[in-house]
Design a protein with these regions (language model features):
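Conserved metal-phosphate-binding beta-hairpin within the catalytic cores
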Residues: 208
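Sec-dependent N-terminal signal peptides
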Residues: 4-13
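C-terminal segment of classical bacterial N-terminal signal peptides
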Residues: 13-19
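Extracytoplasmic cell-surface/polysaccharide-interacting catalytic and binding patches
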Residues: 19-94, 99-203, 212-225
Length: 225
């Protein structure tokens, strides 16, 4: 009897999880960042081979960046604030199709492909999932998360003390070996994003999610075109 109850509990839990987390191809509530912020720059890493897998990622058919309309409205506030301080946004990634996340997981499970180890110089490939650097589900797929940095108005580099997708403690927002300038630059980005309604995470200084995201349980899978 206990075994039957356990099986029923597992089945019920699986059904609840399936209902709670939906996959959708509906992009009607999304828009390109370029339609709202006309001076943002782009370096869409997963459209190229310049990422930890060393290959272009599934679902990226163009070097464009989309977000939910709610997230875009908030991002515009941050961009306006930063523009007044002499900065522009450089976008590395925003909405990410579920098929791209599946591509990451398939790469992790391929023992014959180490990708580009410059992105994880001090870790084993298997550590990327163990350390929660890569997961089977990503907030990016819900459409209100963005990876970005600052550039100056003339397009010149702003030193943030590390680059995108560097799987290292250097990427932690509060890494204590940063220079004073690097700390200041990270804080400028952080303060503008938080003021606009986003929240960061403890492992990646470039990663922000809209606090009141409109689709907290939906994972989208349409291509970036």
């Amino acid at each position: 009897m206990k075994k039957v109850l356990l099986i029923l509990l597992i089945l019920f839990s699986s059904i609840q999880t399936s209902i709670a987390s939906q996959i959708s191809n509906d992009k009607s509530d999304f828009a390109p960042i370029s339609t709202v912020i006309d001076d943002a720059a782009y370096d869409i890493r997963y459209y190229s081979s310049n990422n930890f897998t060393g290959n272009k990622i599934n679902g990226y058919k163009a070097p464009n960046a989309y977000m939910t309309k709610e997230a875009l409205a908030a991002l515009k506030k941050a961009a306006d604030d930063l523009r007044n301080q002499g900065y522009r946004l450089l976008i590395w990634d925003s909405y990410r199709p579920q098929k791209a996340v599946d591509n990451f997981v398939a790469w992790i499970n391929n023992p014959n492909d180490d990708g580009d180890k410059t992105f994880y110089p001090c870790l084993k490939k298997s550590d990327l999932i163990k350390g929660n650097y890569i997961a089977r589900k990503s907030g990016h797929t819900r459409g209100s998360t963005i990876d970005l940095t600052l550039i100056k108005k003339d397009g010149s580099f702003v030193d943030m003390g590390g680059t995108f997708d560097l799987f290292s403690e250097i990427s932690h927002p509060d890494y204590n070996k940063l220079t004073a300038e690097q700390k200041k630059n990270r804080k400028i980005l952080h303060d503008a994003m938080v003021k606009a309604g986003f929240k960061g995470i403890s492992s990646e200084w470039w990663h922000y999610t809209l606090k009141n995201e409109p689709f907290p349980d939906t994972y989208f899978n349409f291509d970036v075109e």
